[in-house]
Each structure stands twice: as structure tokens, then as C-alpha cells.
Regions:
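Bacterial Sec-dependent N-terminal signal peptides
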Residues: 1-22
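Aromatic-lined, polymer-binding surfaces characteristic
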Residues: 28-43, 48-141
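N-terminal intrinsically disordered, low-complexity tails enriched in polar/charged
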Residues: 21-29
Length: 141
């Protein structure tokens, strides 16, 4: 018995030592700093990337004046709302990263605060919860 306790305590001590790893710097989920630099280079040199960049910024600009999302369940699903939330977080995050304009970050924060006030994210349909969680993670990152 003593041997098992010693092995367990040794394992726990070693785990604690290695658990002190440095946290990753934000952003790291989708577009890290290296990816951002590569995208900026592509935008500067290729028309297709310039067109896509413009389209993304137009999408983000349209969100700035759109009403906040409401918790409207269609049938048994909140999927349209959760997918729109995910779309908004992706566009606003991209626009903020590429332009550094604070209004995109403020709107993303407003959207996240808004959906956090929903009664729930429709747990009976796991995909609704998964997409809302993904949107929140991307917005936070």
C-alpha cells in the first residue's frame, strides 16, 4: 500500500511541476500572428485577397448597424441564431485584427455580452450550444 501511495504522490508532484507551462498568447484559435502577417502580405500583393478582404470588412461594417441577436427558437432549434452569432464573431474579429479599429472589438464584446444573457443556448439541441460556445471562444480570443 505504501508503494502505491508513494507512486501516486510522486506522479502528482511531477504533474504539478509540468502544469506550470506558460499559457498561449492570444490570439491562437484561428488566426495567430504569423497567419495574420501572411494574410497582410497576400492582401498587399494579390487582387483576389484584396477583394476578399474588402468583402469581409463590408460584412463587419454591416454588423455594426444591425440589431443585436435575439433568442428566437425555430421549431426545436436556435441554430439560425447560433450560426449568425458565429458569423458575426468571425467577421468582427477579422476586421478588428486587420484594421485595429476599436468599434469592431466593442461590437464583438456587446454581442458576447448579449448572448450570455440568453436564458440558455437551447441545450436540447447540442449543435446550438456548440456553435454558441465556438462563437464565444472566438470572440474571447
Amino acid at each position: 500500500m505504501r508503494k502505491y501511495v508513494t507512486i501516486f504522490l510522486t506522479t502528482m508532484c511531477i504533474s504539478c511541476i509540468y502544469a506550470k507551462a506558460q499559457p498561449l498568447a492570444h490570439p491562437y484559435l484561428i488566426m495567430n500572428m504569423e497567419a495574420e502577417q501572411n494574410i497582410r502580405k497576400a492582401i498587399a500583393s494579390e487582387q483576389l485577397w484584396q477583394d476578399y478582404h474588402k468583402l469581409m470588412l463590408e460584412g463587419a461594417d454591416s454588423i455594426l448597424s444591425a440589431p443585436l441577436l435575439e433568442r428566437i427558437v425555430e421549431g426545436r432549434r436556435l441554430l439560425n441564431i447560433s450560426r449568425e452569432c458565429l458569423r458575426r464573431m468571425l467577421l468582427l474579429g477579422y476586421a478588428y485584427r486587420m484594421t485595429e479599429k476599436k468599434e469592431y472589438a466593442r461590437r464583438a464584446e456587446l454581442e458576447m455580452n448579449n448572448i450570455s444573457l440568453f436564458v440558455d443556448w437551447n441545450p436540447s439541441h447540442f449543435l446550438d450550444v456548440a456553435e454558441m460556445t465556438t462563437a464565444m471562444a472566438i470572440g474571447y480570443d
